Amino acid sequence: MGRAYSGPVALLCFFLYFCFICGSVGSNNTTICMHTTSDTSVHLFYAANVTFPSHFQRHFAAAQDFVVHTGYEYAGVTMLVHLFANLVLTFPSLVNCSRPVNVFANASCVQVVCSHTNSTTGLGQLSFSFVDEDLRLHIRPTLICWFALLLVHFLPMPRCRGS
């Protein structure tokens, strides 16, 4: 029963990938790379010079604390990195960029490829602190597919009414 939506979700992911990824290749962009910080007490959202709701900051800080103190990757870090990168993709003025914007990430660096603007309306550049060096992800298709699957998961199921 749960597989009924898999076809439309796959089609949505495929469509969005070509609309947002392939359409933005080849533009004249500037690459900004945010490398790791040596101070492990600086959390991911606090290290970013961007203001977001405090509950996101708490989740990010808890995930980073877990990784730093145990050495194990915490799955929440990956998901929150995706969420943050998608915010940059959706609102490029956060990092003084104009569209098109591409975001790439690994454990030690988040790369924003965009046309840089000197506007004062943006909130500045970003810095992150990651641990797992093997994490290499292309953000947008992963995040869009994840949210599409999440949306489908919480959609109300059709109910059969007996006669």
From Swiss-Prot:
Q: Does the keyword Disulfide bond apply?
A: yes
Cellular component GO terms held in the UniProt record: extracellular region; host cell endoplasmic reticulum membrane; host cell Golgi membrane; membrane; viral envelope; virion membrane
According to its record, how does it sit in the membrane?
Peripheral membrane protein
Out of the domains of life, which is the source? Viruses
Main localization, broad class: virion
Any one biological process term the GO annotation gives: virion attachment to host cell
What is the annotated localization of this protein?
Virion membrane; Host endoplasmic reticulum membrane; Host Golgi apparatus membrane; Secreted
Glycosylation sites per record: 28-29, 49, 96, 106, 118
Q: How is it modified after translation?
A: N-glycosylation for overlapping sequons occurs at both Asn-28 and Asn-29, and blocks cleavage of the signal peptide between Gly-26 and Ser-27.
Which keywords appear in this protein's UniProt record, sorted alphabetically?
Clathrin-mediated endocytosis of virus by host, Disulfide bond, Glycoprotein, Host endoplasmic reticulum, Host Golgi apparatus, Host membrane, Host-virus interaction, Membrane, Secreted, Signal, Viral attachment to host cell, Viral envelope protein, Viral penetration into host cytoplasm, Virion, Virus endocytosis by host, Virus entry into host cell
Q: Does the keyword Cytoplasm apply?
A: no
Signal peptide stretch = 1-26
Q: Where is this region: Important for peripheral membrane localization?
A: 142-158
User: Which family does the similarity line name?
Assistant: Belongs to the arteriviridae GP3 protein family.
Subunit architecture: Heterotrimer of GP2b, GP3, and GP4; disulfide-linked. The GP2b-GP3-GP4 complex associates with the E protein.
The record's function comment reads:
Minor envelope protein. Part of the glycoproteins heterotrimer GP2b-GP3-GP4 which is probably responsible for the attachment to target host cell. This attachment induces virion internalization predominantly through clathrin-dependent endocytosis.
Protein's name in the database = Glycoprotein 3
Q: Which organism is it from?
A: Equine arteritis virus (strain Bucyrus)
Give the gene symbol: GP3
